[in-house]
Amino acid sequence: MADLLKIKLKISPEVHSQEVGGETVLLDLNSESYFGLDEVGTRVWQLLQESEDMQSVFETILTEYDVKEEQLRKDLKVLVEKLLEAGLVEIEE
């Protein structure tokens, strides 16, 4: 994957989301699979709905949560890889 902060992500139109108790449940209509996001994953998902720019997502999460830049970069990379692998998001060219 290219530099995480330089990519733009687009949420698949086949994915529907619903917040439940501070977490988010994602339903992929193509695979009929459910996915769950914790509190921070939910915030990332909300930010992706507002902006496809990972740099903006990174900066917002960094200011809202008590996390070091290096750890956030690693955690976002893992989350983005899982979302891509599941087909929930796509990289914008």
What are these regions (language model features)?
Residues 33-93:
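Long, charge-rich, low-complexity alpha-helical segments
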Residues 1-42, 46, 92-93:
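Acidic, low-complexity/disordered tracts enriched in E/D and polar residues
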